[in-house]
Curated annotation (Swiss-Prot):
Name the UniProt record assigns to this protein: Ion-translocating oxidoreductase complex subunit B
Gene Ontology CC, one term: plasma membrane
Residue span, 4Fe-4S domain: 32-90
Keywords: 4Fe-4S, Cell inner membrane, Cell membrane, Electron transport, Iron, Iron-sulfur, Membrane, Metal-binding, Repeat, Translocase, Transport
Stored InterPro entries: 4Fe-4S_dom (IPR007202), 4Fe4S_Fe-S-bd (IPR017896), 4Fe4S_Fe_S_CS (IPR017900), Elect_transpt_cplx_RnfB/RsxB (IPR010207), RnfB/RsxB_Proteobac (IPR016463), RnfB_subfamily (IPR050294)
Organism lineage string: Bacteria, Pseudomonadati, Pseudomonadota, Gammaproteobacteria, Oceanospirillales
Length: 194
């Protein structure tokens, strides 16, 4: 019995020593991140869609901090460009929507379920997990979660995914802003449902 207690005590002592060494090392060799990158990253929509030319929002935030243009995020829209301009103290640019069909039109993925073969490639491609389904079963899109990044369209082997325009509803409709208040004339005023 005493042999077991000695082994347990030795393991506890080793765990305490290694824990202390790791704790000390984590404080001593801590690498400070650039706080501006964190602030930029928090303003980006986190869709990880790659439409900006970077593999995700964090690499794009790092590129912006190093001087790259801050107007290449179609999912974020013009509001994100304005917020980034204010944060960085840079000139306000217009959204560079090259590569995006129409950044001002909200789109959502739609899977024609009768044609879906259940390969799960669209599920793997979706950066926000807006597609549900299982292998060899049909898939469907959770419309409220879909960001319209269209990353699911290309991997589909049977081409059963379409990007459809989101039609205004009573919940999403808004008045056009009057021209001259610092916004584009076609931007909408947010409607708050009480």
């Amino acid at each position: 019995m005493s042999g077991v207690l000695i082994a347990v005590a030795a393991l506890l002592a080793l765990a305490a020593v290694f824990g202390a060494v790791l704790g000390f090392a984590s404080e001593k060799f801590k690498v400070e991140g650039d706080p501006i990158v964190d602030q930029i990253d928090s303003l980006l929509p986190q869709t990880q869609c790659g439409q900006c030319g970077h593999p995700g929002c964090r690499p794009y935030a790092e590129a912006i901090a190093e001087g790259e243009e801050h107007n290449r995020c179609p999912p974020g829209g013009q509001d994100t460009v304005v917020a980034l301009s204010e944060l960085l103290g840079r000139e306000e640019l217009t959204l560079d929507d090259e590569g995006a069909e129409d950044a001002n039109v909200a789109k959502v993925a739609y899977i024609r379920e009768d044609e879906c073969i259940g390969c799960t490639k669209c599920i793997q491609a979706c950066p926000v997990d807006a597609i549900v389904g299982a292998a060899k079963l049909m898939h469907t899109v959770i419309v409220d979660e879909c960001t319209g990044c269209d990353l699911c369209v290309e991997p589909c082997p049977v081409d059963c995914i379409d990007m459809l325009e989101v039609k205004p509803t009573l919940q999403t409709w808004g008045w056009q802003r009057p021209a001259g208040i610092g916004e584009r004339p076609d931007s909408r005023i947010e409607v708050v449902n009480l």
